[in-house]
Each structure stands twice: as C-alpha cells, then as structure tokens.
Curated annotation (Swiss-Prot):
Organism: Rattus norvegicus
Membrane topology: Multi-pass membrane protein
Identification of the protein by name: XK-related protein 6
Biased segments, Gly residues type: 33-43
Key words of the record: Cell membrane, Membrane, Transmembrane, Transmembrane helix
Length: 638
C-alpha cells in the first residue's frame, strides 16, 4: 500500500510514520501553536478529543478503553495534569499545524441557520441497540434456563442437545470476535505503530514537546516502556476475560453505543467517532447474524420438535422458542438496515421500514420452522436428508448467481455455502439488481416445501395424540406465510427506501425519523464538506429542487449519522476543504455486499493510521466510482 496526495494536501506514506520525531521537531522550529497530549496525557475531560488518535499508553492507533482521556495512565494522574494544563493555557482547543488559516467556516458562515435549534434524538438509535442487547440476553438466557430445566428433570438427551446448540455456536463466534480484536490491535490490524514520537503526533502541534518540558499538558505524553506494557497487558486481559465469558458481542454493542454518542458530542472529531461506530456496529451485526443461524434457528426447530413429540407445550420451551424466533427476525432486520446505512450509494432504511421488515421475517420464519418441526417429529432421518438437499441446492443457486462479497474465489464459495444455511430458513439477498423474480422463485419453492412437509405430517401423524392441535398447526403454517408475504409486499411497495412510496416530505422530527426522508445536498458530490454540524444528507444519486431543500431545512436528523453540510465562503462559493483522498485501487463492490473497508481489516488499518497523521477530512474513492465515498482525507492505493 502507498499513500499519495491528490494535490490538495501533504502526501504521506507509511514509511514516514517512522519519522514523526523529525516532523514534530520541524514544527517546533516554526513556532506553531501547541495543543494537548494524546492518550490521556493532556488531562482533558473525557470526550474532548478523538479516541482514534495514537494512544500513548499502549502506542496503538485505537484505545480500547474508550475515550483517550479515560486511559489508565490518565485516570491515575488526571487532576494534577489538569491543574498544570490550566496554569499553562493547555485548555485551548487542539489545532493541527498550519491549520490557523484553513479552518472550515462555522455554521454561521454557511447558509442561514434555522431560527429554532435542531433537536437531536439520541434515544432512538440508543433504543435500537438496547433492544438488540435485550433480544440477545433473552435468547441466550432462556436457552440456558431451559437446558438447566431439562437437567433437573433428568431428561439428559434434551439437555445435551439444547446446551450443544448454545455453547458450540457461541464458542465459534467468540473465537472469530477475538481474532478480529487481535487483528485490529496488533500489527495485522490497526496495530502498534512503530517509531511513534514520544512527544506526540504532529497534528497536536509543536507545543506538545514544550509543554512536556515544562510540566505542562504534554508532560504525560511520554509513556515509559513499563507503563505501555502495563496498559497493553490490561487491554489483552480485559478482552480475553470478556471473550472467555462469552460476552464479546455485548462489549461490542456497548462500545457501539459509546462511539455513537461521542459522534454527537464531539463536533471536532465527529466523523472519526461515527466511522469507528460504523465499523464496530458492522462487526457485531455480522457476528450476530452468524450466531443466530447457528444457534437460534436450530434451537427453535429442536424445541418445537420436542414439544410436538411430547404432545405438551410447557411455558419455558414456548418462551425459549419465541425468543429464538424474535432473535432471528431482529438480526435480519438490523443487518439489512445497517448495510443500507453504511452505503452512500443507497438510501437509508427508516425505522418504520425496519419494523415492517422485522415482522415480515417473523411471520415467514414462523411458517417455515413450524412445518420443519411438524415433519421432524415423525420423520427425523428424512428431515435431515431434506435439509442437506435443500442446502446444497440453495448453495449451488447462490454460487451460480455470481456474488461479490469476498476478496478471493474460495472465500466467496465458502461464504455462499454459509448463506445456503440461511436460505434453509429465509430469504437473504446477496446479489445486486432487481430481486422480484429471485424472491418469487424462492418463496414459491418455500411454499411448496412447507405444504409438502406439513401435509406429510398430517397424513402420517397419530390422530389420537395430535387431533387437538392438527388443524390449528396447519392454519399457523399457511396464515403465517401469507401474513409474511403481505408485509413483504407492503415493505417493498411503500416503505422500501427506493420504492414507489408517496412523495411526502417530513414536516416534523418524528416523521423524518420514521420515514427516513433523504435530505438534499448543498454542493456537488465531488466536493464533500467537512462534517460536524447537522445540515443536509448527501444523496449523490438523486437530484433535488430548492423547494425540497426549504421543506427539509428545519427538520432534525437521525443521530449517529454524519450529515455533511456545505458552508460557503464570504465570496459565496462552496467551501472546498484541503487534503488528499483515500483512493482504494479496486472496484467497489455492488450492493448488497459490504464496502471493502468494512470487511478488509487491512483497509481499516490504513484508514485509521492515515486518520492519525492529518486532521483534515475529505473523502474516500473506489477505482470505478465517480462519486466520493465520504470518509477521510488521503489518497491511498491498494
């Protein structure tokens, strides 16, 4: 990889990361204004600066303790450094070297601001994550409770199967989560950056070194080797304990919420916190998707099959089945919402659309699972054969369709085989383009299979033990399927972000949050603006009128999303921020695949290291995309 300038900023390569001492030294000679320390060395309040700068506690580009001022060394000596900083003038805002004459204009320098301040609603996004945590705890907790109940009753067969479908998927997912942590925290990921200046990064200004010399705000910036080892060891111990306790996903959810809140509090580093949150949220959603179809789906079929065989529906197995079903539907809705939110070439899914999506999945999966349980209660061997045949057919269909998710051919085939497991239970879009014909074919096959499995059970069942629920079970299978398809048509016809819904503009905060009305851009997409203030949402693929802009000017926006606005210079021209671009020398993957910098840990490492070097922000661009993917500030080739 190499990094180069596009003419708007200073070219920086990875080799230059080893010469930051010289960069700081040259800044000192020029007498540039200084700033505070990094990694808690400035004694600033939590959240005053980005947690994505180099942490001088552990010499890494990501501090896993959260905000940089919440590092261990900062917590130990926070008050003395704060008083020294106040006496030395160290409480001034941090400024990058040479930035005095090129700061982006404030909101007052742009277009006129609304008379009433915009009301942000962090509760909606926080509530979504809190509900995801509750669904997770409810699913796993009821399964463990049910396994313990089987053990107390002496039903060791059901106890073993129930516990197996809880522990094995959890161990696999926690191993993958810990592997991602290792990649992000070592040289293979975000990594320890060798050769960093102990006096602080150049973006902190030359005063950092002078402050350290006189006991000012930079005095804590030089971490001794022992302190660095202690901090890194504490991070490793913390993450190891978290994953051994099978709580890796819980930690990622909490960290996602923290970064999202910080993206709203910290206007100076809003973009960095926002994308750190997007990376973390993407990771936890992919982990949850994998665990759900390895744990919740088999668990749901197992418990329904046990209840049918025993001809009894006790409270605890029913609760476990309901939570497993809810977990499946929730994860699918959350995954698709996040995938759309992460792509600038697609409109975001509203919360109303996500809710309808959730119930669509809830009903179709219910129909599928009930038919599975009915058939498996009599034909266990044939049910296993059916599942294997269906999985092979779906995997072949997906491979034949030509997906574009992974970097290599064999990884793509493995991914398609995993998606084939998802196709056993529900539809999962993996290819760009119109999906109506593929969905019609899939749901026709599913309806045929559900009907065949259910009627085979009905004709071969024991009438004496099943007459009480045979007809209601048949009704459940077909009514649930029809309800799910109806909700799917409602979603695609009315609530889909690109669907033919009514052209209604948001007139209130609630309407905007629920409908997800896209806001018009102020400037051309090729000149993305510095974020940090709530203005308009860049939607490069859709032209809008000035009337639409006036209608949406006073609405509030969903939190945890950076909405760039286009401030103007006194001359009336759009402000073009300085700085190079991240240029990824590979074609951009088509929707519904993730962008490469979400799934490729090397690209994440590149972005985070480049993010450390220069504070200005411009954008990211893929090789075949004429539009800028708004993110950071460099042009890098892979």
């Amino acid at each position: 990889m190499a990094a180069k300038s596009d003419g708007g900023g200073v070219g920086v390569g990875f080799a230059q990361l080893h010469n930051l001492d010289e960069a700081v030294g040259s800044g000192e000679e020029d007498g540039e204004p200084g700033g505070g320390g990094c990694g808690g060395g400035d004694g600033s309040e939590p959240g005053e600066s980005s947690s994505l700068h180099i942490c001088h506690c552990c010499n890494t580009s990501s501090c896993y303790w959260g905000c940089r001022s919440a590092c261990l060394r900062s917590l130990l000596g926070k008050k003395p450094r704060r008083s020294a900083a106040a006496a030395d003038g160290g409480d001034q805002p941090l400024q990058p070297p040479g930035a005095a004459g090129r700061h982006p204009p404030t909101p007052s320098a742009g277009r006129p601001q609304p008379a009433s301040p915009q009301v942000e609603r962090p509760w909606l996004d926080c509530l979504w994550i809190v509900l995801a945590l509750l669904v997770f705890f409810g699913d796993v907790g009821t399964d463990l409770w049910l396994a313990l109940d089987y053990y107390r009753k002496g039903d060791y067969g059901c106890f073993g199967l129930t516990l197996f479908f809880v522990l094995v998927p959890s161990l696999l997912v926690q191993s993958l989560s810990f592997r991602w942590f290792v990649q992000d925290y070592t040289g293979g990921g975000l990594g320890a950056v060798e050769g960093l200046s102990s006096r602080g990064p150049p973006m902190m200004g030359a005063g950092y070194g002078h402050g350290a010399a006189r006991g000012g705000p930079g005095a804590g910036g030089s971490a001794t080797p022992g302190a660095q080892r202690l901090c890194r060891l504490s991070v490793w111990i913390w993450q190891s304990v978290i994953h051994l306790l099978q709580m890796g996903q819980v930690w990622r959810y909490i960290r996602t919420m923290y970064l999202g809140i910080q993206s709203q509090r910290q206007k100076e580093h809003q973009r960095r916190f926002y994308w750190a949150m997007m990376y973390e949220y993407a990771d936890v959603n992919m982990l949850r998707l994998l665990e759900t179809f390895l744990e919740s789906a088999p668990q749901l079929v197992l418990q329904l099959c046990i209840m049918i065989q025993k001809n009894s529906a006790e409270t605890l197995p029913c609760v476990s089945s309901v939570t497993s079903l809810m977990s499946l539907a929730w994860v699918l809705a959350s995954y698709h919402k996040l995938l759309r939110d992460s792509r600038d070439d697609k409109k975001s899914m509203s919360y109303r659309g996500a809710l309808i999506h959730l119930f669509w999945r809830l009903f179709t999966i219910s129909s599928r699972v009930i038919s599975f349980a009915l058939f498996a209660s009599i034909f266990q061997l044939y049910f296993g054969i059916f599942v294997v045949v269906h999985w092979c057919a779906m995997a072949f269909w997906i491979i034949h369709g030509g997906t574009d998710f992974c970097m290599s051919k064999w990884e793509e085939i493995l991914f398609n085989m995993v998606v084939g497991i998802v196709y056993i239970f529900c539809w999962f879009n993996v290819k760009e383009g119109r999906t109506r014909y593929r969905m019609f074919a899939y749901y026709t096959i599913v309806l045929t299979e559900n009907a065949a499995l259910t009627f085979l059970w009905y004709f071969y069942r024991n009438p004496e033990s099943t007459d009480s629920y045979a007809v209601p079970a048949l009704c459940c299978v077909f009514v649930s399927f029809v309800a799910g398809i109806t909700l799917m048509l409602l979603y695609y016809g009315v609530l889909h972000p690109m669907g033919p819904r009514a052209k209604v503009f948001a007139s209130s905060c609630c309407a905007e949050l629920l409908w997800g009305i896209p806001l018009p851009p102020d400037v051309e997409p090729m000149a993305p603006q510095t974020p940090g203030y709530r203005g308009t949402q860049v939607t490069p693929t859709r032209a809008v009128t000035e009337q639409q802009e006036d209608l949406t000017a006073d609405t509030c926006l969903p939190v945890f999303q950076v909405r760039p606005m286009g401030p103007s210079t006194p001359s009336g021209r759009p402000y073009h921020p300085e700085g190079p671009l991240i240029k990824i020398d590979m074609p951009r993957k088509r929707y519904p695949a993730w962008d490469a910098h979400f799934v490729d840990r090397r690209l994440r490492r590149t972005i985070n290291i480049l993010q450390y070097v220069t504070p200005t922000a411009v954008g990211i661009r893929y090789r075949d995309g004429p539009l800028l993917y708004e993110l950071l500030q460099y042009e890098s080739s892979l």
